[in-house]
Structures are given as C-alpha cells and as structure tokens.
Amino acid sequence: MASEFYIGVKIGATLLGSFGAALSGTRTTLNGLGRVADELRARHTRLGDAMARAVAHPMRNIAELRGQYDRLGRTIDQVQAKQAALATRLARGAALREQRQGLGADMLGTYATAAATAAPVIGAVRQAATFEAGLRDIAITGNLTRDEEFRIGETMRRAALATSQGHNSILEGVGTLVAAGMDAKEAGQKSNLLGRVATATNADMKDLAGMVYSFSETLGIKGDAALKEAFNRAAYGGKLGRFELKDMAKALPEMTAAFAAKGIKGQDALTQIIASLEVGREGAGSGDEAVTNLRNWLSHMNAKATIDAYKKAGVDYQKSMSNLVAGGYSSYEGSLQIAQKFIASRGDAFMKQWKAAGAKGDEEAQRKLMESFGLNEVFQDIQTINHLLAMRQGWDKYQQNKKDMGSAQALNTIDQDYVRRAELATVAWGRFQTQIADLGITVGRALLPSLTDLMNTVTPLIQRTAQFAAAHPGLIRGVVGFATAVIGMKVATLAAGWGLNFFVKSPLNMVSTALTTVGAKWTLFRALWAGGGSRLSTVFQIFGMGAGAAGKFAAVIGRAGSLFMGFGRGALVVGRALLPFGQGMLMTFIGPLRLLAQGGMLLARVLGGQLVNGLMLAGRAVLWLGRALMLNPIGIAITAIAVGAYLIYRYWTPIKQFFGGIWASIRTAFAGVLGWFGVGLPKTFTDFGSHLIDGLVNGIRNRFTAAKNTLIEFGSNVKAWFANTLGIKSPSRVFMGFGDNIAQGAAIGIGRSSAVAARAAAGMATQAAAAASLQRINAARGGSPAGASVAGSGITVHFSPTITVQGGSPDGVKDQVKQGLNLSLRDLERMLDDLLAKRERRAYRS
C-alpha cells in the first residue's frame, strides 16, 4: 500500500566482490576493508537521508529505519577498527622484515668486502710464493747464488710472456733440465726455446725438456741455433708420416742414447731416428710398436751373438760393415743393408708368407717361418724381423725423409707453426692469463719481503707466547676466554637480534596478523550477511570467487537443483504410471487358471505397491539431493559431474566425430603395420566378430531350448495338478459354468433392485413437476406469462469445455485436442436438445 514504507539496506555485488577479493590475502583483505568501509559510509549517508525524508511522513516505519541506521553505523566502526589494526600489523611485519634483511645484509656485506679486498692480494701472494718456491728448487739443485737465481727467474718470466706459456710450465721445463744434469744457467737460457717449441708443436713441456737434454748432452748438439735446427728437423719429420713429434717425444731420449752408444751422433743421428720411426710406423700397428721394433733392432745390431750368427750363416758381418761405413753409411744403416741381403737370399716366398702371418697376428706361424728359413740363427725375435722388413720395403721413403728433413723448408718449421698457433683464441687466452699471473708475481714479490719480515718477527713472539702460555695456563685461558666472549657476544648479539626477529617477533606478528585478518573477514561476512544477498553466492565468494562468477555459478547450481527436483517429480509420475502397467501385465495371466490368477493378482498388488513406494522414495531422494545442491557448496563436485554429463550429451556429435577420427587414425596405423606383416586387420576382426556372434547365438539357442522345455514341463505339471487335485478335466466346461453363474447372479440382482429403481424414478418425476409449477407461479407474480417470458427472451449458453492434453508429439497433441473438441461438441448438442425440449414442455403446459 501507499502508506507502507520500507527501505532495505542491501550490500550488493560490489561489496560481495570486495569481500571475496579480501579473502585472497592479508594485503588484499586490508584493501577490501577500505573499499567496504567507503561503501558502508556511502550507504550510511543515504540511509540517513532516507530517515530525514521519512520524518515528514508519520505513517512510515521510522523505527525500522533507525535500527538499520544504527546497525550500519556499528558495522562501519567495526570495519574501520579492523582496518586500522590490520594496517598496524602489516606495518609492524614490514618493519621487522626490513630490520632482519638489514642485519643480514650488513653481515654479508662485511664478509663480502673483506673477501673481495683480500682475494686479489691473497692470489698475488700465492702466485709469487709458488713461483719463488719453484725457482728456489732450481737454484738449490744448480747451486745458484741469489743474484743468479733472480736473473734466471727474470729470464723465465720473459720467456713465459713471449711464448704464451705459463710460468709453471716454464718452471717445469727448466727444472727437468736441471734435474737431468744440465747446468742451471744454461737451462735457464733454454727457457725461451722450450716455450716456443711447446707452443708450436703443442707437446708436453716435460717431454720437450727431455728432448733438449738428449739433443744437447747425448747427441752433442750444442747452442741455441743447433738445438732449434734439431727441433725443426724433428717437427718437419713428424709431418712426413703418421708419427708426430708430440707422440715420439717420450721415446726420443731413449733412441738418441741407443744411437749415441753405436757412435751415431749429431743431426744425422736425429734424422735417422725420425726417418726410421716414420717408416717403421707404416708397418706397425701403433707408434709404440714401431718404437719397440727399433729398440730391439738397435740392441741386436753389432752384438757379438749377431756377429757369430752371421758367421755361421756364411756372412762376414764385420767386413761387410766396414765396407758399408766406408761407403757413407752409418753403422745402423750398414746393419740394415747386411740383413736385407741375408733376407733376400731366402727369396720372395718367405716375405709373402711372413707378411700374411703378420697380417693375421699369428706369431707362432712367424716363428715357424724363421725356423724353416734358418732366420732364427741370426735374428732372435719377431720385432727385429718386423723392423727389418719395414725398412727393406720403405728404404726409398727412408732416404727421401732424410733428404727432406735437411731442406731449407724444414729448417723454418718451428717459427711458421708458432705464428699459426699464436693466432688461436686459446693461445690468446693463455697469454692473457700469463700476463695476469706475472702481475700477481710482481705484486706478490713486493709484498713477500714485508710478509716474510712480519712472519719472522711474529714467529719469535709466538714462541715466547707459547712459552708464556706453558708457564701460565690459567691466564691464557682467561685471556682467550675474554676474547672469545667479546667476539661471541658480538656474534651472539647479531644472531640474537636476527633470531628474535625471525623466531619470536615475526611469528607473533604473523599470528596477530592472522587473527586480525580472521576478525576482519568475520566483520566483512557479518556486514555482507546483514545486507542480504544470495546465501549460496555468499559462500562461494567467501572461498575467493568473484561476485559475478559466484552469482552465475549459484544460479547454475539452482537450475541444476530444479532439474533434479524435476527428475524427482518425473520419477514419482513414472512410479504412478508403472503401477497400473504392472497390474495390467499381471492381469494378462488371469484366465485359464483361476487359482493362479488370484495369486498373480496378490503378487501384482504387492509388487506394484513396493515399486511405487521405491520410485517415490527415489524421487524424494533426488528432490532432496537437488535442494542440497542448491543450498550446500559441497555439492559443487556432484554438480560438476552432472554438468559434465550434460555437456557430453549436448555435444555428443562433435565428441563422437573427434574420437571417431582418432579411432580411424589408429585403425589406419594398425592396418598399415599389420598389412606390412601380411596380416589383414579387417578380416581378422571380422572372423573374430563372427566367432563371437556364433557363440552368442549357439548359447542363446541352447538356453532358449532349455527354457522352452521348462515351460512345457511346467504347463504339463499345472494341467496334471488341476486334473488330479481339483478334478478339472475340461476347463472350457468349468468356465461355461462360471458364465452361467455370472448371468444368473446379474438377473437376480436386477430383479431385487428393480422396485427401488422405479420408486427413485417416480420421486424424480414428482420433484420435476413441482419445480415447474413453482416457476409458473413466480412468473404469474411477475405480471407476464411464463410462455411469453420464455418465448420473448433469448437463450444464453455458458459453454466452457475443459480439454486435458498429455505431453507428446505435435501430431499427438493435435489429435487429443480434436477428440476433446468433438466430445465437447456432442455434449453441447445434447445440452441444447435438452434445453429446447424443456422449453417446449413449459410452453405446452402454459
């Protein structure tokens, strides 16, 4: 009504969204409190204005407005209080976190500053100390003075910088030369050559130092120029075959010593060694095998046993050697020439069989060949013969290698290779590292004297302190304890501050913040609840869902609940429909067997009632479930399942097409694979399906035959029971008697009640006549004849047909409407006929 006035304060979707967002965290809760407070203040102001306007209308509900105004004011105060408390807790937590981070940063910063400051100094001192220690080892081994040691050290530092080799590498090379017996000052002068050859050949510095010593001291190759020529020959010779210099560097000192023992020295000895190893490597499996073969040959040549063996074989070894040496051959080459002539006397058949056995690795066959051809009398092992045969086959290559190693091109190999190596980034990086290391040595050398003096000064003090500590242990314990206490208190103070912050203050603040947050959320919840709104939507927003999404989701769940309620009602309707259906199905069996019919009717009633009750119970359960889903957020999972099932039903066509495409791909892939193996996939599955159907049909046929036999047996038993027990031989005659009884009973009943029906009809006619007379009297009192009234007035017919249409297809509904209209039309016609007949009777009587 117009006089009724009602104002409801509803905190709607905006406040709901703010409340939902506030649940995501403390910071968002604080922001949500601010927004809600602003909204509440605005609502409070509008409510006050509404109260002011309502004062002018006494009929309006001022008391209700006042109550809402007060409640909203209290809610605003609570929200503001919670907002202030939460802001304070957050500020406290931020301050504690900043304090903790500041303390940790100070400690880490102090440590990092100390480490960063000390790292280069410590590195420089360590580098200088390491170089000084290596240099001192060389000086001690070579009996050098301090000045000589310093000069050699400077020479090695310059060599390291010039050749891009590290200081430690140069120290190792020079130390190897000195340890081998070379003069320390001379070894220091060889540092530049060592570094340059190491960079050019990429060989190990220790192996190169051994080569320098063997060249200089063993072969007598003196001077830097001669040594450089020797390395040029060796480096160039290593490129003439498959045996590089860095691979043969370890074996060269041994080979040079063996050649020097045979009287072969100088550049020729080195040339013959390199050329022999290159040729021997062609017939050997590896470089080590080639070295072994040459070693055995050198130990065999010129031995007394070898000379005697040749003498027994009819060869004057010494005379032949003298002639060959006089002809320009070395003793090594002369021994090879003598042996080659001896092998050639055995023919080419020996060499073919020897090579065939060697290719198979059959040493036993080679030994038998030595015995059969008489070689075992001269040569004691297989390695000797292998070297001899390799040199015999590659003698021309051996001579050419010697010539090439002495050419002008070969004598510039080290410089050319060094220039090419120096262009590499790795060498440039090594040069950079060497420069840094040299700087460290320079800085460290400047600090080492002071540090050494300091340590020398402190050491006696430490000794006196040790003596004093031994004499006064109690005082030492006190001093150490005091110092430890001071440091410990400093550390403990920092640690306690950090620990108090982390383990006490921060957790307490977190707990207080959590409690404040919970209180703020509860205040928001009460404000939200007081403002109204959907309960289910409110619950969803409490768990962090947005206002719009929560409202939509609640509406979806409500519709789902309504759908379940509809399912429940449908189940009830189905239950009611199934009751007569069940009864009808059961009644179809009534007929020939009356006793069984009565039992069937009883069973139908029982089953029908239980079925209806069960369906009604299921319907109520579904109805309850729908209501629960509408009101309880726990039903989200069930609703999600139902929605998923509906979506599958709704979009079954694209889903079926998608999985049909996958199945087609799988079938195509398997058909291709099985087709490659010769297996027909469709035929295989067709055979499998035919076997399956055949088994199913056979099983059904067998079971159907058994069921048919059972029914026949059951019918025979029932017939026999009726015939024997009840004495019914002919059921048709029994039912004829039943029909006679029914007709006779109907006749008796009609005869008994005919008088009652006649009296009722007479009474009805009397009442109709009395009513007609009363109507004529009323018409006469009105001043007009009854007939005139009837004749002069029109006929007013109120016809309101009611048509009940069951659900179904459009054609079915149309047919039902037509049938209803036809029935209603016949009723209308009958009613009009009765009306006209009554009118004629009244007119006639008038």
From Swiss-Prot:
Signal peptide feature range: none
Domain of life, source organism: Viruses
Keywords assigned by UniProt, alphabetized: Coiled coil, Viral release from host cell, Viral tail assembly
A single GO BP: viral tail assembly
Coiled-coil features, chain-numbered ranges: 59-82
Keyword Coiled coil set for record: yes
Protein family (similarity comment): Belongs to the P2likevirus tape measure protein family.
Function noted in UniProt: Serves as a base for tail tube protein polymerization and acts as a template for tail length determination.
Protein name as annotated: Probable tape measure protein
